[in-house]
């Protein structure tokens, strides 16, 4: 349309946006640490960890990456809906102590009550989920109930650019 990129059609408000690489599942904590160091050597300033889903092992992975990188990059943890509330709280406290930037999707995507409790107990920002039941309306419920600190949208999951614009407006309205 009009020969313009989408960001221009939507009314560009930034000249740059932060980005980060994410891990895939690696065999051992040291492999995550090596991957984070590799990305840092390429100029990345943040790294998101997708661990195995076992709380004890996941904390070991996070610790290995933090020890390898020091405070030179922002770290985020996304265990992809792997934990019970008690496990999520325990892991959340551990990554909070390690200075992680955010904690994403620790609980099932429909556990709003668990996310509310987790947010009340932890200081680390909670990012709950791009897979909310009910799409935009599910995200609104997370915001209204204060179950998340950060909204995340995925164009492939949410149904295109228009739903993402609506999510951005929702986030802006409840800033």
Task: List where the protein language model places each region.
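N-terminal capping/lid subdomain adjacent to the active-site entrance of alpha/beta enzymes
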Residues: 1-76, 80-97, 121
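Structural detector of well-ordered beta-strand residues that form the stable sheet scaffold
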Residues: 20, 76, 104, 125-129
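Short beta->alpha connector loops
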Residues: 25-27, 54, 107-109, 131-134
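Conserved beta-strand positions in the central sheet of alpha/beta enzyme cores
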Residues: 46-48, 104, 152
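Short, glycine/acidic-enriched loop or turn micro-motifs at the edges of active sites
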Residues: 51, 80-81, 107-108, 133, ...
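A structural preference for long, well-packed, hydrophobic secondary-structure segments
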Residues: 83, 100, 104-107
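Structural recognition of alpha->loop->beta junctions
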Residues: 91-103, 144-151
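Catalytic alpha/beta core domains of metabolic enzymes, predominantly
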Residues: 110-175
